[in-house]
């Protein structure tokens, strides 16, 4: 049995990545592709690399075009999902790759996004640890009909730090994360600061001082993992790589814990995870190791002189950071094998 699929916003980077992954999924069948500005165009004109869809045509993004499918993936700008979703059947599985339904706290939404607050949906990070109820988020995704996919930066920081927060081996009040990110995370819209002539041979920090919209979501996740207040300083740095995130996150080592205790916390958290892997001691990931895959690689160290735990996490922002997470969560919701249709291995060189 196959499930019929519509992808809204299929002309963008996230939408295109959804199509690439879904092309090899044995149980999810793409029937409808929607777009805004590209409606009426052939897919080959927008995504020439997706030859299996070359002759398909984008249609307008309306609730009418999306209705009647078993699964709808939304790859739309924030603020665009709520109105469309309200018109879709409650029994349709809707997976939103945008920010509209990630935050639980309405005040945080108002402060960082603004506009109408659409409310939180079940959160699409299966590996997210839960301190109070125990277990992981995957048990809370089974059978749901609405899923909010995490932000890509949020995923990288959460996967890097949550085992330590959960085990209490790091101080939650002193978390610092600096992320090297590629421009594809900002979408496909033309912007001067994302032009090749602006970013090649350079690097630039942005949203400095806790102003990035992913900040409250990072805090929300780490507080879910630890059960208490978390203070996090997050700074992204735009670097000249098309895709990928390398997240270097540090936190103060909690009193009374050893290097062995720290490593044991990460080993316990990820021992059975299909897509998150703790690297051997002294080994740290490159972004190229995970390109094209739904895998997250985590390196771990202790800065003895500074008394801090350091994690380095690499993900592909378009796969594990967006489209792969969407499909992984949809698989769970539909009762399919979690890893079905998702690449584990990266592409090299």
Curated annotation (Swiss-Prot):
Pathway: Amino-acid biosynthesis; L-arginine biosynthesis; N(2)-acetyl-L-ornithine from L-glutamate: step 3/4. The active site is at residue 152. It is an enzyme of class 1 (oxidoreductase). It is found in: Cytoplasm. GO terms for biological process: L-arginine biosynthetic process. Keywords: Amino-acid biosynthesis, Arginine biosynthesis, Cytoplasm, NADP, Oxidoreductase. The keyword DNA repair does not apply. InterPro entries: AGPR_AS, AGPR_type-1, NAD(P)-bd_dom_sf, NAGSA_dehydrogenase, Semialdehyde_DH_NAD-bd. CDD domains: AGPR_1_actinobacAGPR_like, AGPR_1_C. It catalyses: N-acetyl-L-glutamate 5-semialdehyde + phosphate + NADP(+) = N-acetyl-L-glutamyl 5-phosphate + NADPH + H(+). GO terms for molecular function: N-acetyl-gamma-glutamyl-phosphate reductase activity; NAD binding; NADP+ binding. GO terms for cellular component: cytoplasm. Its EC number is 1.2.1.38. Belongs to the NAGSA dehydrogenase family. Type 1 subfamily. Catalyzes the NADPH-dependent reduction of N-acetyl-5-glutamyl phosphate to yield N-acetyl-L-glutamate 5-semialdehyde. This is N-acetyl-gamma-glutamyl-phosphate reductase. It comes from Clavibacter sepedonicus (Clavibacter michiganensis subsp. sepedonicus). The gene is argC.
């Amino acid at each position: 049995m196959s499930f019929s699929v519509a992808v809204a916003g299929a002309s963008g980077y996230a939408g295109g990545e959804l199509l690439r992954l879904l092309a090899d999924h044995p149980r999810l069948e793409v029937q409808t592709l929607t777009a805004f500005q590209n409606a009426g165009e052939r897919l080959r004109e927008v995504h020439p690399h997706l030859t299996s869809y070359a002759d398909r045509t984008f249609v307008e993004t309306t609730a009418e075009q999306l209705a009647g499918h078993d699964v709808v993936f939304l790859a739309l700008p924030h603020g665009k999902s709520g109105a469309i979703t309200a018109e879709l059947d409650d029994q349709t599985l809707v997976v939103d790759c945008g920010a509209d339904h990630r935050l639980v706290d309405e005040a945080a939404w108002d402060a960082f996004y603004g506009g109408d607050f659409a409310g939180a949906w079940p959160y699409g990070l299966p590996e997210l640890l839960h301190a109070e109820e125990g277990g992981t988020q995957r048990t809370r995704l089974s059978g749901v009909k609405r899923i909010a996919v995490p932000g890509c930066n949020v995923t990288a920081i959460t996967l890097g730090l949550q085992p330590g927060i959960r085990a209490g081996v790091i101080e939650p009040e002193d978390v610092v994360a600096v992320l090297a990110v590629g421009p594809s995370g900002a979408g496909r819209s033309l912007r001067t600061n994302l032009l090749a002539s602006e970013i090649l041979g350079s690097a630039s920090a942005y949203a400095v001082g806790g102003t990035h919209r992913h900040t409250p979501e990072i805090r929300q996740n780490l507080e879910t993992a630890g059960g208490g207040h978390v203070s996090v300083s997050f700074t992204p740095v735009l670097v000249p790589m098309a895709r990928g995130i390398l997240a270097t996150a540090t936190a103060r080592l909690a009193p009374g814990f050893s290097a062995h205790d720290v490593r044991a916390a990460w080993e316990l958290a990820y021992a059975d995870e299909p897509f998150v892997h703790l690297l051997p001691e002294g080994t740290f990931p490159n972004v190229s190791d995970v390109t094209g895959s739904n895998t997250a690689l985590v390196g771990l160290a202790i800065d003895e002189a500074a008394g801090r735990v350091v994690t380095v996490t690499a993900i592909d922002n378009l796969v594990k950071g967006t489209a792969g997470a969407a499909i992984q969560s949809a698989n769970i919701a539909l009762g399919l094998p979690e890893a079905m249709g998702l690449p584990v291995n990266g592409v090299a060189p």
